[in-house]
Amino acid sequence: MTLFKHWQTLYINVNLATMTDGSESYGEISQGALAISAGKIAWLGKESDLPEHFSVTDEDIEVIDCKGQWLTPGLIDCHTHLVYGGNRANEFEMRLQGKSYQEIANAGGGIVSTVTATRRASEQELLASALPRLTALHQQGVTTVEIKSGYGLDTINEIKMLKVAGLLADELPVTIKRTFLGAHALPIEYKDNAEGYLDVVCEEMLPQVVSENLADAVDVFCEGIGFSLAQTKRVFDAAQSHDLPIKVHAEQLSNLGASELAANYNALSSDHIEFLDEAGIKAMKKSGMTAVLLPGAFYFLRETQLPPIELLRKHQVPMAVATDANPGTSPIHNIHLMLNMACTLFRLTPSEALAGITCYGAKALGLSESKGQLAVGYDADIALWNINQPAELCYQFGVNPLSRLIQNGQQVLMNESA
């Protein structure tokens, strides 16, 4: 029996894009209704199927007439680097003038410049600079964000970054998942001693991160310009010893087999994956991993190798989409632009792209049992959009159609102009 007397809020006259795992056409329910109780979705379906004897005039329930708008799950950005010091606009200009990556690095640019600026910044300075980036995503309907470390590259500053990521949750009603990315690059003081740096990552940084409960997962940048397969395995082993889930930056510039390696550890996701091959895809499917597509970096770096979308479809590997917001290769804080790029550059369908920032974004963070879908018992993180069909969220960007944003059942944003 549906105990509607315990409902706090009921949305009526609304179309639902439930985005349930494996659903087609957005999991649409037209002329629907959705009820919230204690921060969870308590009921959803056709408005005509509301429980018998229920009345929308019940004074104990807030009833919201959505006037035919669309409800989706709150959006999820499952791969970002939002916390960092400085910016690299000067390098952008240098690159457009024809300077090579090495020339920029020799001039003090590249990731070294971000590491230097991040180390110099205080927690409050990093918080102040990250907050507008997170605010931009939040105002676009994002309710869950993953934030990585990786610009400190020493124990004090990696810890500082993760603490700032946690503090952001006190500033905005957004769920923050933190990922330790100490193995992002070699700091200049270890430029000729990768194994020595990994000693610090695995034996000093990671135990402290765990002891202070600062991370939900561990990531590694496995690439020719990053860490080798053997070095990546070393970090994975350390993460596994601390019972932390694994993610990996993999197959962005070449195929080292990092996705296959990560699959052996039942990793959450493999991200970038432009050079992923079928063997890696099969391994990901077998272990239940998610493929995270990052079209912003593909665009900003003017890459030409497309991710193997057809093979991912063939083997039914879930595809998430994220901003990869970072100062060097994707200084983009617009989730709707990512939807459009996923469709136009990678040829995802709009329903695949939207699934990528809802149910499969949740899966990439290990949250598939609580977020990313409109389903009974799931967290009431939902977004109301003034659109005529869900594809509009992928079709256009620059105009924000968000009408209301609800986090854990509480309205946190309202845009009367939408």
Curated annotation (Swiss-Prot):
Disulfide bond entries: none
Residue positions binding Fe(3+): 79, 81, 249, 324
Enzyme class label: hydrolase
Gene Ontology MF annotations: imidazolonepropionase activity; iron ion binding; zinc ion binding
Cofactor (UniProt): Zn(2+); Fe(3+)
Enzyme Commission number(s): 3.5.2.7
Top-level taxon in the UniProt lineage: Bacteria
Family, per entry: Belongs to the metallo-dependent hydrolases superfamily. HutI family.
Function: Catalyzes the hydrolytic cleavage of the carbon-nitrogen bond in imidazolone-5-propanoate to yield N-formimidoyl-L-glutamate. It is the third step in the universal histidine degradation pathway.
This protein's name: Imidazolonepropionase
Native organism: Colwellia psychrerythraea (strain 34H / ATCC BAA-681) (Vibrio psychroerythus)
Gene name tied to this protein: hutI
